[in-house]
Amino acid sequence: MATNIRKTHPLLKIVNHALIDLPAPSNISVWWNFGSLLGLCLIMQIITGLFLAMHYTADISMAFSSVIHISRDVNYGWLMRNIHAYGASFFFICIYLHIARGLYYGSYLNKEAWNIGVVLLFLLMATAFVGYVLPWGQMSFWGATVITNLLSAFPYIGNLLVQWIWGGFSVDNATLTRFFAFHFLLPFLILALSVIHILFLHETGANNPMGINSNTDKISFHPYFSYKDLFGFLIVITLLATLALFMPNLLGDAENFIPANPLVTPLHIQPEWYFLFAYAILRSIPNKLGGVLALLFSIFILLLVPLLHTSKLRSNIFRPLTQIFFWSLVTNAIILTWIGGQPVEQPFIMVGQIASVAYFSLFLFVIPITSWCENKFLSLN
């Protein structure tokens, strides 16, 4: 009898266990597609980024011109740039939906995979931030100046830390060079951590919408879920191509069409849309250090979610009260995103402060207490 090479070859065996013969719960829904979509986004970003890096010049006198050169003179350079820019937005859409699914269905109880996922989110945000600086437009320069300046809020070492990151006394050539180096390096670190993320996930197997043990009802990943994932790929690639080809500047800031000028400050300094919720939390606290700590905590609060799980049930599917507060959290995050893009004036300041308090309260108090109450209602002692 002929042996199947994918089941015996040392390398193919790993791929087989991860992508072909992987036992998957039969009832996982479309919300489980986003893991593979994140993989697609990462591969697309690395490939387009590699081609862009071949023509980009990390020097303040040439960076802006080199981006124009890519858009005008390089074969399909405009397409690579548009896909790379929109790819970042799609990456964040997918990761936020992936996290929301994890929160709703209790996937965070697989603590190792969840914690590595939070680290991946942080690395993705760092990569996107340093990447946004590279075109060296007005918003690139001032965004870099404002965000790196936040480190000066830390007592004693703050100013030293800022100058160390800048490589001088202001955002200058040294800053751009190192940001390019970080932007090139970090995606490969994300790729390595993604493999570890998948490794930990496959130790226990995927969660499912019911939040119960599904060992008695598993089907192979291929062909059932591989085709389902391909359908997701098709939708994302279609949307990405439509936006990149028909609306290339929809999400870009108009200020970034102006070369960086340290003497002229833009009217509203704001990051890309995917950072606005954290930026709104930062702005809602009048104290500089307090704002920076709140900004960091708005992301790292996800690490506390497994510790704050008080329910006897894993998934939210049978917990109507927790569902209400979960959707309140989603709405709250959308409100914070909107507030982050508004000028610093009333009533936006007050709305931002209320939404920031609600954001942390829902995570730390409201959802854990509601879950505990539901245990009592259902007599789950």
From Swiss-Prot:
Heme b b562 binds at residues 84, 183. The cytochrome bc1 complex contains 3 respiratory subunits (MT-CYB, CYC1 and UQCRFS1), 2 core proteins (UQCRC1 and UQCRC2) and probably 6 low-molecular weight proteins. The chain crosses the membrane at residues 34-54, 78-99, 114-134, 179-199, 227-247, 289-309, 321-341, 348-368. Component of the ubiquinol-cytochrome c reductase complex (complex III or cytochrome b-c1 complex) that is part of the mitochondrial respiratory chain. The b-c1 complex mediates electron transfer from ubiquinol to cytochrome c. Contributes to the generation of a proton gradient across the mitochondrial membrane that is then used for ATP synthesis. It comes from Scyliorhinus canicula (Small-spotted catshark). Its cofactor is heme b. One of its GO terms (molecular function) is metal ion binding. InterPro entries: Cyt_b/b6_C, Cyt_b/b6_C_sf, Cyt_b/b6_N, Cytb/b6-like_sf, Cytochrome_b, Cytochrome_b_C_euk/bac, Cytochrome_b_N_euk/bac, Di-haem_cyt_TM. It is found in: Mitochondrion inner membrane. Its main location: mitochondrion. Keywords: Electron transport, Heme, Iron, Membrane, Metal-binding, Mitochondrion, Mitochondrion inner membrane, Respiratory chain, Transmembrane, Transmembrane helix, Transport, Ubiquinone. Disulfide bonds: none annotated. It is a multi-pass membrane protein. This is Cytochrome b. Heme b b566 binds at residues 98, 197. A ubiquinone binds at residue 202. The gene is mt-cyb. Binds 2 heme b groups non-covalently. Belongs to the cytochrome b family. GO terms for biological process: mitochondrial electron transport, ubiquinol to cytochrome c. Heme 1 (or BL or b562) is low-potential and absorbs at about 562 nm, and heme 2 (or BH or b566) is high-potential and absorbs at about 566 nm. GO terms for cellular component: mitochondrial inner membrane; respiratory chain complex III. CDD domains: cytochrome_b_C, Cytochrome_b_N.
